[in-house]
Amino acid sequence: MSEPLPAPLPAPVVAAGTPISVPLEKGKEYWYCACGRSADQPFCDGSHEGSGFTPIAFVAERTGKALLCRCKQTGSPPFCDGTHARVPPERVGTSYRVDERDAGDRGAMPTPRATPEEPDLELIHELAEHGLEAVGSEGPVGAMGVPRSLLPHWDDLQILTAQLARRPLEADVPVGTELVIGPRAARPLRLEIPLLVSDMSFGALSEEAKRALATGAERAGTGICSGEGGMLPEEQAANHRYLYELAPAMFGYREELLPRVQAFHFKAGQAAKTGVGSQLPGVKVSARIAAIRGIPEGQPARSPAAFQDLRTPADFRRFGERVKELTGGIPVGFKLSAQHIEADLDFALAAGADYLILDGRGGGTGGAPLLFRDHIAVPTIAALARARAHLDRRGATGQVTLIITGGLRTPADCVKALALGADGIALANAAIQAIGCVGSRICHTDRCPAGVATQDPVLRRRLDVERASLRLQRFLGATVALMQVLARACGHSQLRDLNRNDLASWHRDLAELAGIAWSGAAPPPRTLG
């Protein structure tokens, strides 16, 4: 069955009946409001969330004033082309679209507009007109992960609860929630719950967001991962279950930091942009971030695609053994995205991994080339099922901790992930939403309206650290409590006892992806009569 075509965009709001002259700086990137809702016209402030619109990125070609469109009818955004003259004054502040038959010179070439039938039309025209000059060497960039509508749905996995063949547990029966990361390590990391805050760097997130996440996780009895931007001292001090991530750029890494961490992992990749490295825009590299990362202020922070001096399992094993020597034996693991899953897991196991953080398609980031975000990686549901099956085959189950991440949001999602074989779940998007993120998907612009993914001091002041940390604590506590409700209904007194027998799906393809039972009745064999 073919997928339904996406609905056409609604008409934008006419923000004003005239253009506005604004100063631009050559080489600087700006984000133009396309929806008309922004209070910071003509630039985006995140108000497009839920509108179906996305802001338009452009780089100023020269320093000076430019006349930018506010009527949202221009055929050459962000610049005014005179179309505002055709907008009735009474339509200011309302949704409106000029009839394209009257929108410009009848003798001129028409303006390309993407349609449900040809959704890539504008990209093709952009590449044909400008090459990579405007969009950058890796193509257009977007924030967060693949839209959820393009992924297998956790909601299409059904939980099978107990009744006769297995009895459910009463509401007063305790349900264990502990997660031990790296049980074979000399100093395994013990969390009170199987949820933790995933890797998000200081730089991608504000200091206030990092402190709120660390404090909220600590209050909930769980840990936080550092992200690849180095150790923010205030974050580390706020949480005594701190998992340090070392990425190929090795930002700010020094051995003297190791006694302050409780687990350590190498970053091999992340679902939204594995194989291409990463970059924090220079506008986000404040003096504090530059000092922690050991890089120049105001310059882009680039991380290579792979470690330069660590290539073989033996190389990583030697590095990991040094980490253990300096820390008394904390767990050492890998964060990897779901690509060549079995081969990459074998590499990590050969390198001595105590734990694995597997990021499936659906996992997000502050900014990734859409060429990668929208076209790489195995979806989280299938990736998790394959990883657990492979660890079972290798005899690593119970020895190497498997933590899944990438698109999980709700208590039901987390229960299903545990049943599919995850030992723990690392939450990124859900965690930042709990502290205030409203899903504007403009993290890479430094204009986050909630103060979460920005270094702008005015926007950062919107995030109250204490209030945000309490929100995360409540979210994690409520999520685990609801997970316990479902575990009792399935007859389990430990969350870790959830298994594939607790799941089925009426989507046959999804059942095969997940390695679980199909809910339907298989047809009887055909006979010849």
Label every PLM stretch briefly.
Residues 221, 239-242, 260-263, 350-355, ...:
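Glycine-enriched alpha-helix->loop->beta-strand junction motifs that scaffold or abut catalytic
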Residues 30-42, 66-77, 356, 408, ...:
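Cysteine-centered iron-sulfur cluster-binding motifs in ferredoxin-type domains/subunits
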Residues 409-414, 418-518, 522-523:
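Gly/Ser/Thr/Ala-enriched C-terminal appendages of enzymes
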Residues 200-202, 229-231, 247-249, 269-271, ...:
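Active-site beta-loop-alpha junctions enriched in small/polar residues
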Residues 2-14, 67-78, 82-112, 460-464:
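Flanking helices and flexible, charged tails adjoining ferredoxin-like Fe-S electron-transfer domains
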Residues 2-42, 46-68, 91, 100:
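N-terminal pre-ligand scaffold of iron-sulfur
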Residues 101-195, 199-215, 222-223, 230-231, ...:
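Conserved, well-structured core domains of diverse proteins
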Residues 304-460:
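Glycine-rich phosphate/ribose-binding loops and adjacent secondary-structure elements
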